[in-house]
């Protein structure tokens, strides 16, 4: 009889999606960049595992990387200095018409968000003086000269809202088409996404609550012309078991709905940031 742990391993291999082999080798240069950030940014590392995540995505200095929805630049502050002067980084944002769809932003806020796209190179310049090439554009305004130049496109906690407005405006389709256009032949897409359990009702997986199912994301990328290369549990959090009405923003760092309730806040803080899938895809013909 085979040992139980071997049988378990065989069963998992049969049931699970392709998983990356664990490789504890992380570029010391990447670790140095991560360590050099301010303490507020580093406080999130225990949940976001940037060194392991970027290593899993096989990112290295000199690459051209497009970051979808860079926001305040949490990952930009790592990528820009790490890619270095021989690399390039692009910040790719929602199309201008997407912002009003959220329904809760004032006109001034919408204008600020739209303007932030063009300010991405300035953000990069504030992070590093290496002279790295930087550009900011939207999913529907990819510069033709950048087509086929990217080694990686990253969707880090970015796909839920793109899926949320897919039926209304084709936002996910547009974003993945932009990714495919940007990538070199054989280039890869890295995904980190809040994960809804596979046995949860589908109503919670439209993106409006922040969560998507892993099978749903894989199908979405495959339909757009990518193949799954590997999956990882780097960013998994088994403590996060969302109920039918739970939103991802109930958890840190947002803590929506509990900031004035110490007990609820403590409970959400104890869970930590969300359970997340980490997936790597390759562009295929």
For the regions a language model picked out, list residue spans one by one.
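C-terminal lobe and adjacent flexible extensions of AdoMet/dcAdoMet transferase-like proteins
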Residues: 224, 264-285
């Amino acid at each position: 009889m085979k040992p139980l742990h071997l049988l378990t391993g065989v069963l998992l291999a049969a049931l699970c999606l392709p998983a990356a082999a664990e490789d504890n080798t992380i570029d010391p240069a990447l670790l140095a960049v991560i360590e050099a950030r301010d303490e507020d940014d580093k406080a999130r590392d225990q949940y976001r595992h940037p060194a392991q995540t970027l290593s899993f995505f096989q990112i290295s200095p000199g690459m051209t990387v497009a970051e979808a929805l860079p926001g305040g630049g949490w990952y930009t502050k790592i990528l820009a200095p790490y890619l270095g002067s021989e690399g390039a980084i692009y910040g790719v944002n929602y199309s201008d018409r997407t912002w009003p769809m959220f329904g809760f932003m004032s006109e001034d806020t919408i204008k600020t968000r739209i303007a932030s796209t063009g300010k991405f190179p300035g953000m990069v310049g504030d992070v590093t003086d290496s002279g790295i090439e930087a550009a900011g554009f939207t999913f529907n305004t990819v510069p033709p000269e950048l087509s086929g130049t990217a080694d990686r496109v990253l969707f880090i906690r970015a796909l839920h809202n793109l899926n949320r407005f897919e039926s209304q405006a084709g936002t996910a389709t547009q974003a993945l088409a932009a990714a495919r256009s940007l990538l070199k032949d054989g280039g890869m897409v890295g995904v980190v996404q809040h994960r809804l359990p596979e046995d949860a009702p589908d109503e919670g997986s439209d993106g409006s609550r922040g969560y998507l199912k892993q099978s749903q994301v894989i199908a979405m990328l495959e339909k757009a012309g990518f193949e799954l290369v590997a999956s990882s549990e780097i960013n998994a959090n088994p403590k996060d078991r969302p109920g039918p009405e739970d939103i991802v923003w109930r958890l840190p760092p947002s803590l929506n709905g509990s900031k004035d309730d110490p007990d609820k806040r403590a409970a959400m803080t104890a869970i930590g940031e969300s359970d997340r899938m980490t997936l790597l895809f390759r562009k295929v013909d």
